[in-house]
Amino acid sequence: VRLDDVFSRHRPTAVIHLAGYIEVGESVNQPERYLHNNAAKSDILIEASLRHGVEALVFSSTCAVYGLPQTDLLAETHRIAPISPYAESKARVERALAAAAARGLRSAALRYFNAAGADAEGAIGEAHHPETHLLPLAADAVLGLGPAITLLGTDYPTPDGSCIRDFVHVSDLADAHLRALDWLQRAPQRGIHQAFNLGSGAGYSVRQAIAETARIAGHAVPHTVGPRRPGDSPKLVGDISKARHELGWTPKRDLAVQIEDTLRWRRKMPR
């Protein structure tokens, strides 16, 4: 199905662009694949949106566009310096959206930190094949549904040697998308582009997240130690004050809730 046909049939006034490959390590081994799928194909979507009079576009970007942090708390004004093809692909889309503002498109790039959690009822959640995300891997390990989790690097310049990440619940992310869309549609001017950090504003190390999983599950998480994963930053924690102020967004579900929801989902998940 051609994009032009879809736009002509449904005549959308707004687009929420969530699609794309997301694995940092895989992108290092397959850079052309990531740049083609994530960046080049997004260019096609942006051009189609402009041709068909779309007024607003919300894009799922990533905190990985910042690269190696220059400050403890990353604000949207931090330099953009991707260190993986995945991050570069997202940065390219952000640049394309910024350029499209000159042609009248309103857009928001939502820079996710570490998306986590699942539906509170356990009806839906992430199910990658193979799974690469920390919380579902830790959940499977502690529930006996998967192998021991491997800590990818324990020699980072952090207090316990493991990476520090800012985890944000997927339900809070969903709320942010709706708020961003509403913000764009209410904007008085045509042709704007803004980026917003979406995180919790607090950092937890990989070791801390594993320990919290063990506490909630009631017993230790089997784990081993492995080498660093190419393209990983030692610490990524977001300053979310802009999203709070501009979008009226506040994350409501902390790491414990994210882990509880992940455990519930992994128990129920079809395999």
Residue ranges and their predicted role:
Residues 17, 43-85, 99-108:
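Conserved Rossmann-fold NAD(P)-dependent oxidoreductase catalytic core, especially the SDR/UDP-sugar
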Residues 24-41, 74-82:
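Short alpha-helical oligomerization interface
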